[in-house]
Swiss-Prot record:
Biased composition (Acidic residues): 339-358
Lineage: Eukaryota, Viridiplantae, Streptophyta, Embryophyta, Tracheophyta
Stretches the record annotates as Disordered: 73-129, 180-361
Function: Binds to and supports processing of specific plastid RNAs. Associates via its C-terminal Rho-N domain to single stranded regions of 16S and 23S rRNAs or to rbcL mRNAs. May be involved in targeting transcripts to RNases such as RNE or RNase J.
Cell location: Plastid, Chloroplast
Protein's name according to its UniProt entry: Rho-N domain-containing protein 1, chloroplastic
Amino acid sequence: MAMSGTFHLTSDYVPGYTLSDSRCFFNSAVSRRTLAILPCSSCLDHKNGRLKSVPNRSSFVCRASSGGYRRNPDFSRLNKHGYRGNNRQSGGREDFDIENSDMLSSRNGPLFNLSSSPKFQATSSPGPREKEIVELFRKVQAQLRARAAAKKEEKKIEEASKGQGKESETVDSLLKLLRKHSGEQSKRQVSKFSSQGEVQGDTVDKQDRTGNLVTSGNKDNNASSFTRPTSSFRRKSPVPRSQSPPAYSSEATFDQSSSYSVTWTQKKDTVELHDEPEHEPAYEHEHEPENESEPGPVTTMLEPDSELKPESSSFYQEEEDDDVTFDVLSQDDGILDVLSDDDESLDDADEDSDEAEEEAVKDLSELKLVELRGIAKSRGLKGLSKMKKAELVELLGSDSS
């Protein structure tokens, strides 16, 4: 308790304080009694002390401070030695103390009450400032609680948003996987279709190739059938056989299937054309429809072209044009008879061929180019494809001479 100053004690009872000790000393016929007031917060007991004053009524001074009390050296000495005659004088002092207390009370006024100080009141009941502080503290606590609740709500919202984000991420990943799977399936289907299309294309190509081969074979067969049809036509020449017998080559062969093929050379054609009259083609055209109705087996012979224009073609092509092969097919027995007749006439043709050639040489200038070439080939001459008619006539004339 920080308190300093001078005051007069008029009461023998001071609450919250105790009297440590009391000694009485006499100086110049004055008896004084000092009080040492010490704070005692732990105990509630109070001791009563009475003040004694000298007859001249002189008051005593009590000073108190926060640092404690200052001891009077005289008072400390008195405390050491003590009052030996305190008990002896106690009876006489009581009356004097009562009188002094009355005098002090009348002089100093009302009693000094320490409980009325503001610090005792502050400890007993809170003041307005303390109430304001408590209210402010409560407000701060409420604000802090509100902030904590808001933070918790924000955390919950963030967690919910994160959960939604995770869900959206999972959904996106699933969509990506599904898209990849669908793309792979589409690629596989496309590859399968392409492979099937390639296989089908290969099969179609194979079928086309086989079809082309078959059609080409059929065309060849048809061409062969059209180029060499079986015919029962027999050409009747007005020229007797004895004068101009046909000369067959030794290459004629007979097949087992009752068919034979005879190769005619240009020589034979030229001899027959030379012996036949000029009106033979018209005669043939006139008698062709009548002979077609005849069922008998005959042989066919193609005539060479009436005129042959000189062209810059190879020697082999001309030989192919000159050589014409005929295949006559027949199943009747008459064909064998014709063959036997032809075989008999071969010998006669060989004998008469020399005579026919001698007669033909006389009129070489009247013959055509094709006929001249046939004669030259029959004589074994070569390199005739590029020669003209005059050159051939000279060659044949020089050869015959």
